[in-house]
Amino acid sequence: SENMICGGKGINVSALLANLGYESTALGFVAGFTGAEIEKRAKELGFASDFIHVKNGMSRINVKMKSDEETEINGMGPDIRPEDVDALFKKLDGLKEGDVLVLSGSIPSMISHHIYEEIMRRLEGRGIRTVVDAEKDLLLDVLPLKPFLIKPNNHELGQMFGRELKTEEEIIECGKELQNRGAVNVL
């Protein structure tokens, strides 16, 4: 059987919040017919979107084939230019005190690997809480900026500390270390 799902961590967060009765606005980059489909599905799922429309390329198509083993084919995504990133920054400048910004997922290859840090620095002192759900270095790099909440899974937590975490005590110990490094809350 075939199934098409619009996803990505940001889309999934907004969809979950809508299901729980909370308003949110999904931000990010879309392009081409797949970007139009993402916007359409966002509306159907009950949340607002305010995407930057990228001129070249199309939003990624990731194919997952399931049988005894899962095979993954991930598309490249659109060609995000510096002016597209500037447009995102302008949208983020509209956030107000008390707002919550979720930074989630991987960073497209043509964007600075430090964009989460850049965004958090830009928001510093404005009373905006940041939640970061990302892998290893993306997460470790933002800790000095004191994110309100980080959400590493067990595997990601083990990657950050260079070991497999087998007990609840080890997980708690690593979570506390992340708080010592700057995270306000670790989920």
Tell what function each PLM region has.
Residues E2-M58:
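Substrate-binding N-lobe of the ribokinase-like
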Residues P78-R81, I107-I111, L138-L140, Q159:
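Short, small-residue-enriched loops and turns at beta-alpha junctions
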Residues V54, M65-E97:
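Conserved phosphate-binding/catalytic loop of the ribokinase/pfkB sugar-kinase fold
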Residues E72-N74, G98-G105, D133, K151-E156:
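Short beta-strands and strand-loop turn motifs
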Residues E117-L187:
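Conserved phosphate/ATP/ADP-binding segment of small-molecule kinases
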Residues L95-V100, K146:
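Short acidic/histidine-rich motifs immediately flanking catalytic phosphotransfer sites
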Residues M110-E118:
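Active-site core of PLP-dependent enzymes with the aminotransferase class I/II
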